[in-house]
Amino acid sequence: MRNICIVVTARPSYARVKTLLNAIKKHPKLKLSLIVTGSALLDKYGSVINVIKKDGFEPTSIVHILIEGESLLTSAKSTGLGIIELSNTFHNLKPDIVISIADRYETMATAIASSYQNIPVAHIQGGEVTGSIDEKVRHSVTKLSDFHFVSNKDAADRIIKMGENKKNVYISGCPSIDLAKAIENKKVKKNIRLPLKGVGHDVVLDEPYLVVMQHPVTYEWDKAFDHINMTLSAIHELNIQTIWFWPNVDAGSDDSSRAIRIFRENKINNKIRFVKNLPPEEFLILLKSSLCLVGNSSVGIRECSYLGIPVVNIGTRQDGRKRGENVLDVTYDKKTIKNAIL
């Protein structure tokens, strides 16, 4: 049997590969080695590992690599620690191939640790342009990878121009669209039980609500506090029920979280519920029934495009990515954000 290793590092990476995990698990000639690492192990980012286990996937290895601090320095140090720890893990598991996702620093560690041991790497969602450190990581991982599964033709062409063998480049689309397709005709059900998850206002799911996902931008990480405050102010003044997901683990996320906590303490009478995480299908069903998605998550570019959900994309985090007509780009300005939502 071929030993296929998948590394899940965070909330979004699990959503990207859940259907792939199922396919490998069911295949009679494949063995799944599942490594869970990074923020997927931490309660402050929603304990993604618990969702993974509940879905029936038992991790083969759990690898702790994150250094606390959420700064540029700790991101670099976590990458180094990730290389050390994942190198040992790959050496012990001896996979035939390692599958890595997207463009985070954990992805860089995965690609280096496997390629230096002559273990082939398959990279999902390479070849895209965003202009931040993520793009540098993404293109570096492309050069460390042997097989490339990309979202669109532009990404495929870009990888081929980088010198990769076109026979090893596959336009597979975004794998999270598999999940979006599966929930396409489903509606929000009360069994999502949002009142028991997160803190803040109890959202009534059969009344209009917004969803917010806003993360710090790596080359603007020192402005994360101000960026979040601008969006918080806009949402608060709109006085519409809102489900707000905590930011990813990136440089600046501590400041983003601090801004949210200060707002939560000072603005008692608001209609926002802050949630760490939801299982992928529940999240997509929730999103599909919302008025729109606000923030700077790639979910707005990918899943929302497929599901036809309006998106107010704030700032530069998704600059360069292909997008549908459902996306409206705005700056970090309270009035502009409010007008775009309305």
Whereabouts are the PLM-identified features?
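Nucleotide-activated sugar donor-binding and catalytic core shared by glycosyltransferases
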Residues: M1-L342
